[in-house]
């Protein structure tokens, strides 16, 4: 982003691909609606079987900042994915928005981007192809990545509080927290299963639930930065001494 000079930014993961009209349709949507962000939908491409599955939860239209941020936090019709969107570059430069060095960095950052967008347009077309491979973040899930997922959820709370709008989106944030908790339960079980050790799996799940409750609670100190947010989940190797 530091070397970008154009009016708009768009991101594509190196192992994914896009439809031939991907940029054209996003550009037309953002310019014709005088929007700050334009979003499209995507296909899951399961590489090994060469099967395409279109993401099912969709919407279409032009949304105000509040409407779009609320949808983003619910993480269904609009998701915290950096790569199926085009952005007005000034949102980043004028608000000093960068991506932290962590897994799930888009989740930690998307809320800041949307909080500074006056208008968001969504087109109900799947123009991006998200390759599901054995080397992706979720396919290679481990304790460090699960901890970053939880940390990213806390960073969303910190960002909303810092912007003075948390109370406006508290219900949506709680929905995001519940979804994160359920996803992390699944990732914890998957991690233990891949390591062929279920010892400590309940300990890790309890830690996840406790951390998510804390980050969504009234006593959470939102002045923390992400480097100060502690790890929650341990590797199965580190938990072998625990009793399930």
Report each predicted region and the residues it spans:
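Donor-binding/catalytic cores of nucleotide-activated saccharide
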Residues: 14-121, 131-141
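Membrane-interface aromatic/basic loop that binds lipid-linked glycans or pyrophosphate carriers
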Residues: 35, 191-244
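Short, charged, amphipathic alpha-helical segments
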Residues: 169-176, 202-203
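Catalytic core of nucleotide-sugar-dependent glycosyltransferases
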Residues: 127-133, 140-165, 187-191, 195-216
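Short aromatic/hydrophobic "clamp" motif used to bind/position activated sugar donors
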Residues: 9
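Amphipathic alpha-helical repeat scaffolds of TPR domains
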Residues: 174-187
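Short, conserved alpha-helix that lines the donor NDP-sugar binding/gating region
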Residues: 1-2
């Amino acid at each position: 982003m530091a070397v970008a000079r154009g009016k708009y930014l768009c991101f594509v993961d190196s192992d994914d691909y896009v439809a031939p009209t991907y940029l054209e349709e996003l550009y037309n949507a953002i310019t014709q609606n005088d929007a700050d962000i334009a979003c499209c939908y995507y296909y899951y491409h399961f590489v090994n079987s060469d099967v395409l599955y279109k993401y099912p939860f969709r919407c279409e239209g032009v949304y105000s900042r509040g409407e779009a941020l609320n949808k983003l936090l619910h993480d269904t019709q609009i998701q915290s994915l950096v790569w199926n969107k085009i952005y007005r570059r000034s949102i980043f430069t004028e608000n000093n928005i960068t991506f932290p060095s962590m897994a799930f960095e888009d989740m930690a950052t998307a809320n800041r981007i949307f909080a500074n967008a006056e208008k968001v347009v969504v087109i109900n077309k799947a123009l991006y192809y998200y390759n599901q491979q054995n080397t992706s973040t979720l396919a290679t899930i481990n304790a460090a990545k699960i901890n970053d997922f939880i940390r990213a959820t806390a960073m969303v709370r910190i960002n909303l509080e810092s912007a003075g709008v948390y109370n406006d989106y508290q219900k949506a944030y709680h929905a995001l927290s519940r979804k994160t908790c359920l996803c992390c339960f699944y990732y914890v079980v998957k991690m233990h299963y891949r390591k062929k050790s279920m010892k400590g799996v309940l300990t890790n799940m309890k830690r996840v639930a406790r951390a998510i409750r804390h980050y969504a609670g009234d006593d959470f100190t939102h002045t923390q930065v992400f480097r100060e947010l502690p790890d929650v989940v341990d590797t199965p190797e580190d938990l072998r001494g625990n009793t399930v």
